[in-house]
Structure formats: C-alpha cells, structure tokens
C-alpha cells in the first residue's frame, strides 16, 4: 500500500479553503447579467466558451491533492444543485465559498465546529421556510418566459421559445433540445403519441407528396407477437372492411404471407391498412403497447391475458382521429381513450419515475408520460459557429430546467433579492450557545454573497447596493443589467424557488462537512527514483583495427 500524506487541523483546513477559493473564483465570474465568460481548453478541437457554472466547475482539477479535495467538494455542490434543480450552480458555489471561508475563520479563532454547523443548519432551515412563504406560483406564459430568459443569461429569444413549447405540449410534455441547422432557434411540435417505427412496406404510402401513409379515423390493432399467418387476421380485417374504416396494425413483426396479403388489399383498395413494428424491446415494448391501448381505448391482443388474435373482434380495437406513418415514425393523433383511464395510467408511470434509480429509465418513463399527456416539442438551437452552438445549447438546457423548476415550486424575486429578504426575516434567530449564534450569523452573511457578486460583476460597489436593497421590502431589488432599482417581478427578474432553495441547502450541507473536518489523508508524492549511472565504454578495446 502506498504511503500517505496526512494533514491535521488548521493546516488541513487552510489548504482545503485555498482549493475552494480557486474553484469558486473561476465559477463566480459567470454570475449575473454582466458575468464574464470562461474559456475551457479541450484535448482536441477548439476551446469551449461558457457562462455555465457547472461546466466550469467540472473542468477544474488542482495539482495539490489537499487543495483539490476542497475544490472537488465544492464541485459536488454545483453538480448536486444542477441534478436537483437544473440550474443555480453558480449561486450554490458562491454560497458554499462564503460559508466555508467564514466558518474556517471561526474554527481558527477557537470556536466549536459542531456548534457552528448546528447554527448554520438552523439558519438555513428558517430561510427555506421564508423562501416558501415569499414564493409565488408560476401560472402564465409571461412568467415562464421571464424565468427562461434570466436562466439563459438574459436571452429573451430562449425564454420565449421555451414558454411557447410549454404552451403547446403542456407543463408535463416532453421538451427536448437539439442542434439545429439554421441560424435561428426553431420549435418543432409533435402532437399526440409518436414512436420511432415506420411502415413495413413502401406500398402502404397513400400520400405521395409527403411520402407517408395517412389514415383518417382508423381502427388500431395492438398485438405483442409476430403475425405471419393471414388466417389469424381475417376476422379483424372482415370487421374493419364492413365498417369501411382504415386499419393500423402495431405488432412485434408482420411478415411473409400476412404482409403480402395486406399490401395486395391496400393496392386494390379493398381495405386501407398500414402495418408497423411495435416500439421498444422486451418489457418496455409491452408497457408502450399498453400505453397505446389506454390512449386509443383498445386492448392489447396478448396470449398472456388469454386473448388470441384469431378470436379478436372489432370491439378489441382502438380508435384515433388520425394516424400518420412515415418511413421512420408513426404518430397517433387524438386517441379515443377514456381521459380518466389516461390520467390513471400517467399517475402509475409517475410513481415508477419516483421509484427508479436509473437516469435512463427515468428519461424513458418521462417520455411515456409526455406521449400520453400531450406531445413532444423539439427546440432546435440555431447558431453561426459550432462553438456558439454548444454554448447556446447548454444555456437552452439550463433555461429549460429552470422553467420546469419554476412550474414545480413557484418563483421568487431574482438577482439575489429573495435570499436578502429571507435573511432579514430570520435575522432574530439565536442559538443555544454563543458558537451556534455565530454559526447563524455566518449563514446570514453568506446569504448576501450572491447579490454582492452580481453587483461586483456589474462593476458597482456591493456594500452600497446591498444596503439600499435591505432598506426596501418585498420584490424591491437591483437590476444589474441596467443599473436601476425597482420591483424585480416587474423587471422580469425571477428565480425558481426550487433553484434558490436547492443552492442554499446543498451549499450548507457541504460547508458543514468541511468546517468539521479535522484531518485530511492523500497519497504521498512519489520520490523520483535515482537515475542509473551513465554506461561507459568497454575497457581494453584500444588499438583494435576494424
């Protein structure tokens, strides 16, 4: 086992705080409307330019192992806040730095670290309650657009396109972000349920212009096995032909004689049919077929529940207003399912989302909720260069997370004002002893740090602006973008409550751990091995002729 280098007490904390400061100073330069860019070197290709706090934090590794431990712990604050709320990483880092720096000074002055931690926790708990009190629900599109704009570094076009996307697919709908091919941002909305499977034969195409198969008011057959024998399909085909309606078949596979018969019937105009493969694999395929059954009011024809295809009737089929099938996608629009059954199914999937620990499963389950609840919107990010595209896409994703958080827990006045209002409300707190009270004071001073940093990045004097904001009440604050004081809500400067709350709680959590650290252990640096002596020539070789 390698030898270890161990540091204790003040020496350990000093090095750790040094690492915290290096990382936090790089990250906090990006805070606020006048925050600066940070350039990140890449191992290949052009460097990345970003104003995204978590992107900066992730790139930082320090040479000194003890300093690096401090930096990595603050990096954890940024990452955790990003995971919880999707934004607020820079605010969390600024709060953590302020808490750790003041806490380390207090410990050096001889105060009890555990009491300091208890005091900080007490203040944060009270501040979170106050944040919830001043929070307002987000209901209108304007507020959603404002939250998105602030999170995207005051880019109104991003805030507006996110608000439009949410309006079209609902607050539960899936909104994805992709790299576009143009210069402007574009919004592409897919209504109804879409899955990534297209027609099994080009002979099903009936719309030559769009090269798709369009079915109006069709019946929908859902089957979880292969269909290769046309005799199994005859009862359903006869029923559909009598009703004079088209038919969409979604099955594991339609092949051989069955597929050939369907193609011939379609070409001759006897019955309009389109066959597609079921989406997904294994259990996910079964679940998605069930979703389709609920959406269309049909039944999945499955031997597992005692239903055989040859016994299926027209009553087992689902219905929809319209179905569009292209080469790669199938879209079911306005299914005839019972709305109560759809809501129940959505609730069931949401429970699974809460229970799952896999990010991949969570993403797929959320997609299923969206497909049942309203549709999918795709924001295509436009930019003139690849570097700008990457930076802009990261900002759009941040803004999207922030707006979701705002819908979930409401909004508070932005620009660091909410934390200033919370600290004024909990300023009378007292701890069980002097050290705990000092811990409370540390937390209250730290809650001023985001506003101070926003003002400093705007080139103004933080203390002067902070005192003026403290003199005001409610939403009164400082707009760093134009240097005006006024109502932050009217200025459109809003932060999601969840983002501010998560930033404060995560910063306090890591700061508490770091203040109470008494020893640090790292691998000792390896000493360079002594070099081998230089080899000399062989003796006794003189005078030889070659």
Swiss-Prot record:
It catalyses: ATP + H2O + a folded polypeptide = ADP + phosphate + an unfolded polypeptide. It is found in: Cytoplasm. InterPro entries: Chaperonin_Cpn60_CS, Cpn60/GroEL, Cpn60/GroEL/TCP-1, GroEL-like_apical_dom_sf, GROEL-like_equatorial_sf, TCP-1-like_intermed_sf. It is an enzyme of class 5 (isomerase). It holds the Pfam family Cpn60_TCP1. The keyword Chaperone applies. Its main location: cytoplasm. The keyword Nucleotide-binding applies. GO terms for biological process: protein refolding. Gene3D superfamilies: GroEL, GroEL-like equatorial domain, TCP-1-like chaperonin intermediate domain. It comes from the Bacteria. Its EC number is 5.6.1.7. PROSITE patterns: CHAPERONINS_CPN60. Keywords: ATP-binding, Chaperone, Cytoplasm, Isomerase, Nucleotide-binding. GO terms for cellular component: cytoplasm. ATP binds at residues 30-33, 51, 87-91, 415, 479-481, 495. CDD domains: GroEL. GO terms for molecular function: ATP binding; ATP-dependent protein folding chaperone; isomerase activity; unfolded protein binding. PANTHER family: 60 KDA HEAT SHOCK PROTEIN, MITOCHONDRIAL (PTHR45633). Forms a cylinder of 14 subunits composed of two heptameric rings stacked back-to-back. Interacts with the co-chaperonin GroES. Together with its co-chaperonin GroES, plays an essential role in assisting protein folding. The GroEL-GroES system forms a nano-cage that allows encapsulation of the non-native substrate proteins and provides a physical environment optimized to promote and accelerate protein folding. Belongs to the chaperonin (HSP60) family. This is Chaperonin GroEL. It comes from Xanthomonas axonopodis pv. citri (strain 306). The gene is groEL.
């Amino acid at each position: 086992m390698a030898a270890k280098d161990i540091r204790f007490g003040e020496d350990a904390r000093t090095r750790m705080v040094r690492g915290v400061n290096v990382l936090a100073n790089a990250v906090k330069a990006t805070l606020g409307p006048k925050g600066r860019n940070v350039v990140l070197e890449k191992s290949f290709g052009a460097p990345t330019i970003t104003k995204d706090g978590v992107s900066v934090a992730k790139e930082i590794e320090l040479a000194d192992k003890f300093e690096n431990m401090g930096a990595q712990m603050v990096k954890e604050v940024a990452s955790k806040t990003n995971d919880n709320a999707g934004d607020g990483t820079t605010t969390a880092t600024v709060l953590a730095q302020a808490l750790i720096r003041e806490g380390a000074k207090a410990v050096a002055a001889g105060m009890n670290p555990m009491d300091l931690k208890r005091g900080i926790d007490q203040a944060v708990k009270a501040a979170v309650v106050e944040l919830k009190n001043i929070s307002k629900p987000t209901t209108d599109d304007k507020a959603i657009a404002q939250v998105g704009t602030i999170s995207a570094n005051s880019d109104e076009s991003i805030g507006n396109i996110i608000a439009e996307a949410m309006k079209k697919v609902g607050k539960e709908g899936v909104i994805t972000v992709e790299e576009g091919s143009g210069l402007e941002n574009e919004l592409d909305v897919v209504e109804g349920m879409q899955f990534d499977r297209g027609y099994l034969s080009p002979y099903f195409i009936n719309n030559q212009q769009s090269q798709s198969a369009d079915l109006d008011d069709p019946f929908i057959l859902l089957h979880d096995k292969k269909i290769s024998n046309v005799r199994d399909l005859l009862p359903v085909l006869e029923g559909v032909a009598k009703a004079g309606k088209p038919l969409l078949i979604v099955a594991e596979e339609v092949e051989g004689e069955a597929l050939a018969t369907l193609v011939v019937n379609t070409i001759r105009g006897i019955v309009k049919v389109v066959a597609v493969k079921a989406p997904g694999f294994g259990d996910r395929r079964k679940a998605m077929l069930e979703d389709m059954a609920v959406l269309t009011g049909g039944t999945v024809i499955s031997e597992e529940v005692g239903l055989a295809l040859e016994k299926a009737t027209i009553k087992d089929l689902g219905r929809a207003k319209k179905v569009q099938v292209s080469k790669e996608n199938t879209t079911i629009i306005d299914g005839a399912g019972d709305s109560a059954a759809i809501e129940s199914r959505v609730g069931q999937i949401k429970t699974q989302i809460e229970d799952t620990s896999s990010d991949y499963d969570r993403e797929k389950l959320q997609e299923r909720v969206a497909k049942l609840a309203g549709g999918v919107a795709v924001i295509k990010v436009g930019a003139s260069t690849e570097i700008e595209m990457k930076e802009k896409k990261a900002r759009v994703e941040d803004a999207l997370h922030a707006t979701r958080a705002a819908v979930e827990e409401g909004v508070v006045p932005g620009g660091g004002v909410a934390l200033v209002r919370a600290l004024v409300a909990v300023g009378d707190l007292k701890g069980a002893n002097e050290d705990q009270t000092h811990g409370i004071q540390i937390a209250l001073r730290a809650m001023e740090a985001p506003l101070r940093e926003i003002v400093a990045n705007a080139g103004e004097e933080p203390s002067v602006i902070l005192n003026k904001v403290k003199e005001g009440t409610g939403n009164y604050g400082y707009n760093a973008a134009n240097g005006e004081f006024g109502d932050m809500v009217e200025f459109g400067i809003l932060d999601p409550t969840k983002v501010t709350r998560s930033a404060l709680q995560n910063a306090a959590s890591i700061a508490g751990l770091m203040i109470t650290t008494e020893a640090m252990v790292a691998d000792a640096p390896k000493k360079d091995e002594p070099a081998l002596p230089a080899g000399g020539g062989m003796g006794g070789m003189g005078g030889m002729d070659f």
